[in-house]
């Protein structure tokens, strides 16, 4: 199970997230472990690849809630950015933002092993 020190080193704002998790380290760590396995990351990728910006917005918005509540800052920053761009249906290449999101998710997933 990932430790608070590992999460801090990765960039999570543990001090912000812990009160939301009743200051229970094991509970927070379990939630982080579940978050990195969230299928919504892949659904976001699939929706963007299909050009379905409405679905992509739904998935990005859902991820924003998860990553924000757990204060997973390195993922949350690009998730928030892509959510707002999708909300306004900005015509652009979402690939770089998606790559950053998935890269940070994968890095955190490795730490959770």
Residue ranges and their predicted role:
Residues 1-113:
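Two-component system phosphorelay core
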């Amino acid at each position: 199970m990932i430790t608070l020190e590992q999460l801090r080193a990765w960039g999570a704002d543990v001090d912000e997230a812990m009160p939301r998790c009743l200051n229970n380290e094991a509970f927070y760590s379990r939630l982080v472990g579940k978050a990195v396995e969230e299928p919504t990351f892949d659904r976001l990728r699939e929706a963007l690849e299909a050009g379905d910006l409405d679905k992509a917005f739904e998935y990005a918005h859902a991820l924003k809630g998860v990553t924000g509540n757990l204060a997973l800052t390195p993922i949350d920053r690009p998730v928030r950015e892509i959510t707002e761009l999708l909300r306004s249906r900005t015509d652009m290449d979402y690939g770089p933002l998606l790559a950053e999101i998935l890269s940070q998710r994968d890095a955190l997933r490795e730490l959770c092993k």
